[in-house]
Amino acid sequence: IETGKGDFAEEVLTLNRLAQRMRKTRFKRGAVSFQREEAKFKLDAEGKPLGVYFKEQKEANQLIEEFMLLANKQVAEFCGHHKVNGRAVRRTMVYRVHDVPNEEKLEKFRSFVLRFGYVFKADKGRAVAKEMNKLLGQAKGRIEENVISNLAVRAMSKAFYSTDNIGHYGLAFPYYTHFTSPIRRYPDMMVHRLLARYLEGGKSADRDTFEKLCVHASEREVIAAEAERASIKYKMVEFMQDKIGQFFDGHISGMSDWGMYVELDETHIEGMAVSYTHLRAHE
């Protein structure tokens, strides 16, 4: 895309223009623009980390993302917004839903970013998404960007699977599901089966059965995410193991009663500087 050359260049560039237009429209409608950095490790032959780098987000990634979102949205709408003789008929569907932000979490987020000099005004509705995008734009490229971006994600509600459609707040979609990755996510496989059933004119599937599967999938997703975070932290500790005594530039990313969290500027590895008072109290 960057060079504008190669096989099928015209077709790819046309798709990219459409993707960028869809992306712009999505944010205008109130989608939240989270740009989280994905940590990767350079490993030696034995799997020991030699360095930390971050996956770069390019227009090609955005192209794939926008058409993936479009496919997920259209499948959810087709299955969930069905009409017979002009009348809406509810059919069982596995949705990926995202509720409005929790006001208590937003208040904590507001207090934290204020320490960096940012003013976050909104507390509910679509105004939160607009204000969040504004703040993330202001923090972009600054030393605290990663910390604020991560905390912004935590301030939002957690997306989950359900047969009860409440829409997807973060994407600003009234209908949304996970359809595009059936080889790695079981909810996508459920959606494929439901779509095939409805395309063939089948009746609505049993809602209770699929709701139980949605609850199970959501629970397992949380466990998988925790395991992923733990594995990344393990590799970061392994990377820093032979660097004890060295000096690094960093910034305070959080505070607690027993010390402060510090994030290194270059690698974004976070650790705790335990307070002397806390150490003395636990001798």
Where are the regions that the model predicts?
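Electropositive polyanion-binding surfaces
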Residues: 1-279
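A short, hydrophobic C-terminal helix/tail in secreted or cell-surface proteins
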Residues: 281-283
